[in-house]
Amino acid sequence: MSKALLTKAVITLGAIFALQSSPSIASEGQEWIVDNETSHFHFVSVKNNAIGEVSTFETLKGHLSGNGQFALEILLDSVNTGIEIRDQRMKEHLFDSKTNVAFIVNGSFDLEKIKDQKAGESSQHTLEATIQLGSETLDIQAPVTIQTLADDQLRVTSVKPVVIATSSLKLDGGVDKLKSLAGLRSIDRVVPVTFDLYLKPKSE
């Protein structure tokens, strides 16, 4: 066999091996969990029509199953505004975190849409989900980028903020209480939310 033919054969075999060994994202048995250490969830509040403040929830739990069902828990006790007294007021008067443990987000996504993505590749999609707080629910649509990473990991990032009205989850009374306690003229009733979630394969 000539050197050129040998080289071509090696390249062809290598390509076939790479395709055969590439893991399938849309495997029914696959399951991912949210990596809390690297994931982020932020929201912006605006007071007195002029001052915007970025806050976060520091504890996120969630999973994505091989059939595309996903769930995310945003623990309310983990709210971090950068000011401790404000955190406590939000937990007590806005979220009632002793009764309501978390925002719960549920939805589904067709994993077939990303099954051919290789590590480093990404694509944009719209996630349809339901947010629940206590007995209140809100349907949302979230434009996201889904990136396939090494080791079967996924990254799901909001393309633009998801804007949530406080009235949709019956939070207006809590907002009024916070405004009164802080001596503010106003607190905006629409809240932009962004997220950057890393999902890793669930270990057995």
Regions found by a protein language model. Give the residues of each.
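Low-complexity, acidic/polar, glycine-enriched regions of mature
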Residues: 25-204
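Serine/proline-rich low-complexity intrinsically disordered segments, especially terminal tails, linkers
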Residues: 4, 23-26
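C-terminal segment of classical bacterial N-terminal signal peptides
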Residues: 16-24
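Bacterial N-terminal signal peptides that target proteins for export
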Residues: 1-11
